[in-house]
Each structure stands twice: as C-alpha cells, then as structure tokens.
C-alpha cells in the first residue's frame, strides 16, 4: 500500500517520517506507531514525575532554573518531540491504533 504524499503532507508535522516510512506494509507502520505510543507514555510519566518533584514555587512559575528544573524541561522537550512524531505517524497510518495500558 503506497500512501499519497499529497494527502498526508497537509497534516503531517515531520516530513522526514513520510520518506522513512514510504513503502512499509501497513502492519509494520502500525507496529512502529504502537511502539511510539508506548514510548510517549513512558516519557509523559517521566516528565510528570519530574514535575511533581519540583518545589511548589517552580510549579507555579514563581521560580525557575537550576538542575532540577532543567531536568524537567529536558524531559518535557523529549516528550513533546515524541508527540510530534507520534502525530505524524497517526496521519500517515490514517488511524490511532488501540494499545493496551501496561
């Protein structure tokens, strides 16, 4: 099954994923997407744990900076970057696969 770039590119955020996944059988693309969903869930959990560990002044925006805050920001960047890739995979695949919660 070849996907039409014209149909996908209107909503895709990460164009390199179109080329990387071009020609893949739908089952392989679904496997990649399911793995990306699981990765995203782990990253969300990690970022949330780091946020919850921040002092209240950081959570409310009254303070910022320092190693602990930087670790949270880096985890959030990683989580959001993964979400962009995941949204692109959803667009290419054409649906959101069901994934059992671990």
UniProtKB/Swiss-Prot annotation:
<keyword id="KW-0614">Plasmid</keyword>
<protein>
    <recommendedName>
        <fullName>Transcriptional repressor TraM</fullName>
    </recommendedName>
</protein>
<dbReference type="GO" id="GO:0045892">
    <property type="term" value="P:negative regulation of DNA-templated transcription"/>
</dbReference>
<keyword id="KW-0678">Repressor</keyword>
<dbReference type="Pfam" id="PF09228">
    <property type="entry name" value="Prok-TraM"/>
</dbReference>
<dbReference type="InterPro" id="IPR036336">
    <property type="entry name" value="Tscrpt_rep_TraM_sf"/>
</dbReference>
<keyword id="KW-0805">Transcription regulation</keyword>
<keyword id="KW-0804">Transcription</keyword>
<comment type="function">
    <text>Negatively regulates conjugation and the expression of tra genes by antagonizing TraR/AAI-dependent activation. TraM may either bind or modify TraR or AAI making them unavailable. Alternatively, TraM may bind tra promoters preventing TraR activation.</text>
</comment>
<dbReference type="InterPro" id="IPR015309">
    <property type="entry name" value="Tscrpt_rep_TraM"/>
</dbReference>
<keyword id="KW-0184">Conjugation</keyword>
